[in-house]
Amino acid sequence: MKFLDQAKIYIRSGNGGAGAVSFRREKFLEFGGPDGGDGGRGGDVWVEAVNGLNTLIDYRYQQHFRAKTGMHGMGRNMTGGKGDDVILKVPVGTQIFEEDDETLICDITEIGQRYRLAKGGNGGFGNLHFTTSTNRAPRRANPGQEGIERTIWLRLKLIADAGLVGLPNAGKSTFLASVTAAKPKIADYPFTTLHPNLGVARVDGREFVIADIPGLIEGASEGVGLGDRFLGHVERTRVLLHLVSAQEEDVAKAYQVIRGELEAYEHGLADKPEIVALSQIDTLDPEARKAKVKALKKACGRDPLLLSAVSHEGLNDALRQLASVIDQSRAAEAGTAEAEE
């Protein structure tokens, strides 16, 4: 399935149905009074999060959505039926913005969550509403109210517990494939990963979701390489696993480049808990490994994890550390929620 994480669409709620001009027509009743019913309300436009979606690709092929007009009123004081709604089905994690692409309308974070983006127009009054003491047979009815039209942006920010960051070819996709059932594209050239991938990891009876995003390079915040647009997909994570390839000539610089891009992106990414790991260590001899571990430790201020997807060295340790941070974050979040109640 192709991946699309943003789409610009046009929506319009339905017009209200027109009120009816009608009079009672009954045997032995020469001058029946007005009995024109009201028009029905126009259909609404809703957005709803559904299970099983992780892309906005459907909105590449259809960008215009219009709800139905309400039914017109009828005689015998019958109100017209409501127009059919339009429901925009989106993945969990979708944000809806105004046309300026800055004003947030809503953030859809749970399956089944709905939000009304445009309310249908009210139906017009039938002639029964216009009866007065001096006008017992009005021939007037209102048209329905027009629907609301607006242009909006849909932006998807995947919801994951942990995010993988690093330079291209740092081994992020290989790590994801080794610890989850995800099958990202893996090859020995930069930018093999062109869109985010998700996988569910399990360790010690616990499970959590990991997001792998395309690699960053120096200047990504200014649009170099694939830019930093995919960093939005790790904004919601609780912890970052920062992979630095053992094949880098200067592991300290590789670490600092990514930290610089996280800080330039802002949105709190640089403040997230971070676990640092030296990946692809199976490519080093013991002496080179020791030197690179020392250099990376000096750069990040802590002992890095040592990982190899080939020999599986350190994979479970990494998962346990991620799970521990995620558990602490969830517990703190639950405590905050209880305190607010």
UniProtKB/Swiss-Prot annotation:
Q: Needs which cofactor?
A: Mg(2+)
Q: Which parts of the sequence belong to the OBG-type G domain?
A: 160-327
One Pfam annotation reads GTP1_OBG
Q: Does the keyword Hydrolase apply?
A: yes
Subcellular locations according to the entry: Cytoplasm
InterPro entries, alphabetized: G_OBG, GTP-bd, GTP-bd_Obg/CgtA, GTP1-OBG_CS, GTP1_OBG_dom, GTP1_OBG_dom_sf, OBG_GTPase, P-loop_NTPase
Q: What EC number(s) does the entry state?
A: 3.6.5.-
Residue sites binding Mg(2+) per the record: S173, T193
Provide the residue positions that the database annotates as binding GTP. 166-173, 191-195, 212-215, 279-282, 308-310
**One GO-annotated biological process of the protein:** ribosome biogenesis
Class of the enzyme per the UniProt entry, highest EC level: hydrolase
**GO molecular function (one):** GTP binding
Gene Ontology CC annotation, any one: cytoplasm
Annotated keywords: Cytoplasm, GTP-binding, Hydrolase, Magnesium, Metal-binding, Nucleotide-binding
Q: Where is the Obg domain?
A: 1-159
PANTHER family reported in the protein's UniProt record = DEVELOPMENTALLY REGULATED GTP-BINDING PROTEIN-RELATED (PTHR11702), MITOCHONDRIAL RIBOSOME-ASSOCIATED GTPASE 2 (PTHR11702:SF31)
Q: Which family does it belong to?
A: Belongs to the TRAFAC class OBG-HflX-like GTPase superfamily. OBG GTPase family.
Description of how the protein assembles with itself and partners:
Monomer.
NCBIfam families in the cross-refs: Obg_CgtA, PRK12297.1, PRK12299.1
* Function summary: An essential GTPase which binds GTP, GDP and possibly (p)ppGpp with moderate affinity, with high nucleotide exchange rates and a fairly low GTP hydrolysis rate. Plays a role in control of the cell cycle, stress response, ribosome biogenesis and in those bacteria that undergo differentiation, in morphogenesis control.
Q: What is this protein called?
A: GTPase Obg
Question: Gene symbol?
Answer: obg
